[in-house]
Amino acid sequence: MIADLKPYSAYKKSGSLWLGAVPSHWEVQNLRTLIRPYNERNRPDLPLLSVAREKGVFVRSLTDAGENHNVIPEDLSNYKVARAGNLVINKMKAWQGSMGIAPCDGIVSPAYFVFNFAIANRSFGQALLRSRPYVAHFGQASDGVRVGQWDLTIRGMRQIPILLPPPDDQAAIVRFLNWSNGQLEKAIRAKRKVITLLNEQKQVIIHRAVTRGLDPSVPLKPSGIPWLGDIPQHWEVRKLKFEMRFCGGGTPSKGNLSYWNGLIPWVSPKDMKTEIIRDTIDHITERAVAQSSTNLVPAGSLLMVVRSGILQRTIPVAKSICEVALNQDMKSLTSKGRLDLDYFALFIRGCEKQLLHEWTKQGATVESIEHHYLSNTKVPIPPIQEQQQILDQVAGETAPITTAISRFEREIELLREYRTRLVADVVTGKLDVREAAEKLLDEVQTLEFEDDLVALEEDVDCSL
């Protein structure tokens, strides 16, 4: 169905270079004609809403620190009220697409814009404003010294041209996008499930190697670690504090511009998405290191996330290949000589579930690895030469799995990119979806993606 989409039959000039030609029966109005500021406060009884690039506007969980690290003040009386259907914009991150329609009555940060939005179909309006061409234009309408401090202004956004198809066309576009997003999301979920299965296979291989070694015939002994059981007799068991040096970090003042945009990589949890840290999103200056609580750690250090909502599921660890600074949610480890850092990272990945239970404080409102638990953890330590042998053996056994995971992750990236381009083409009138929308049934259809999960699971064996 998607492949059969064609342009509209007639177009006209939009009056905007970045929008180009638009369907001849669509209107173009400046955003100022469609929005009116909505000012209401002092409703702390309403649910707290937040805005994110990926989600749009959503009800914020007060217990899940992984959603947002911003501190919630005790007094919410000054928070703005957003009524269901209002347009909410995070003015400091509009250039990233952090905007959307409020799904229910709630309250938002005083730093957000809240507007009444006079458009026939608010779901269409949301899809339009969050599309790639419009997000880029909101960036142009923002002021600031550097990207991270861009601030959307009312003056800048008032003249943004808004495309207005007839109400029936808006409804058709929304219906088609809901269907196509559902189909693409189904394919993405199928690939994610296969990645999960592959990661489980990989973890089994790692766990066996770091807890029993490579030779199944060696005699065993009790480890003295309740969750671990027996280990090879010639391995030692030592507390981590006797084998590692630990270093924490901090955040230089965001208000001091002389601390930021320097040459020193500053690692925070958002950088910990790979096993090797070569660079970071944020950089700081030497002055920031000298005048704040952050610390420099040498190249070759093992970096670990110790405070983040992601610790509900996994323990991100990575090795730095350059000197870096850390924020307060990170910790670095350097070896005293008997425990190879690459091997210890492998041990963490192989025993992640058990270590999460050992290292995190049960009942804490913010997921964090307690240093006392971490430093006093008993770990089995093979001779240093055997550690390298285990690393080499595991790398060889898991290489085909790693390759398969990378392939599926790349396919997910391509599907997301395709979805982004499809939405942009549909909401800006490059593709006519009216006929396609008429053919859609009200119930969820599976069509060409219905067998994805089965096909992908069968593909696992072929990938290994």
Question: What is each residue range found by the language model?
Answer:
Residues 14-15, 29-84, 241-256, 270-299, ...:
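Sequence-specific dsDNA recognition surfaces
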Residues 47, 53-68, 87-111, 127, ...:
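Short, ligand-facing micro-motifs at secondary-structure edges
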Residues 10-14, 91-92, 106-111, 146-171, ...:
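A short glycine-rich beta-alpha junction/loop motif
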Residues 9-44, 159, 167, 171, ...:
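Non-catalytic DNA-recognition/assembly elements of restriction-modification systems
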Residues 1-19, 25, 165-218, 378-464:
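Amphipathic alpha-helical coiled-coil/heptad-repeat segments
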Residues 120-125, 338-343, 388:
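Short, conserved charged micro-motifs
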